[in-house]
């Protein structure tokens, strides 16, 4: 009896290892580029394909929507209210707007299946795509079709900083390590154009968010900061700061702004409805009054959603990441 039990256990172990090995081989048996091993990219567009097995699709009664954590979360919950109502009508689903406090938490929430539709900030898009299976498809743009923002390095009047080189020996506020304009782009630019490195040439600090950095400079808590000028524009128009409270000493090329999309395993029919919700949204109500989304985002000259692809529109961001030796591996 003991010998028989031992044989059965040995068989079970061998069979289990065989299944595990087969599972690993199956996971590896598809092209994926830099995507996490859970995903496949058979069409080569750099984003995760929908699962081929329909049983892996998610089709919840309530879709969780998260907007990139910038500025005051309460402001943006109000701003997205009319759009949420529109998306509910188009998808036939309940939509819950969920407030999240950091870029890393947003990526982890999508990776673990807790959010389905999201707007990820510029710098977080590559990690969200590669680690969480995010599929971006649209971006906010002005009515003339222009879109994007610039990274600015700002200081306050009377700081003694008139050009980038003057930051040497002073402190410079970044936002978070995953932010393009708040960390990755300025890091690459400071090194390449000015031969300036954190700790060696200036004291780096992280404020957490763009509005924290902007307010920190305006209040003279930071000598300088790297920020997204679209956030600065909205803060000025909301009278959070005055335009004269800060001075721009560097302005970058234009970068794509927040990318909106869905998680890769969202039921394809639902994913199509989500895309339709963005493309069909009218920024003015039938009576001609502006929607809550327009009221907020016209402050940064945005008034429509335009289709984009991660492969094309985030190429410059991937180049910056490569220069900074950024890894897209899940942590």
Predicted regions and their residues:
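Bacterial N-terminal signal peptides
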Residues: 11-22
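An extracytoplasmic/periplasmic, membrane-proximal ligand-sensing/linker region
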Residues: 28-67, 71-82, 262, 266-331
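Short, glycine-/small- and polar/acidic-enriched structural segments
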Residues: 29-159
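Bilobed "Venus flytrap"/periplasmic-binding protein-like clamshell domains
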Residues: 65-88, 123, 146-215, 230, ...
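A local structural motif
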Residues: 88-99, 193-207, 242-245, 327-330
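Short helices/loops that flank or line small-molecule/ion binding pockets
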Residues: 104-118, 131-132, 165, 210-230
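A ligand-binding cleft/hinge motif common to bilobed small-molecule-binding domains
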Residues: 122-132, 186-192, 216-219, 223-243
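Short beta-strand->loop
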Residues: 135-146, 203, 236-254
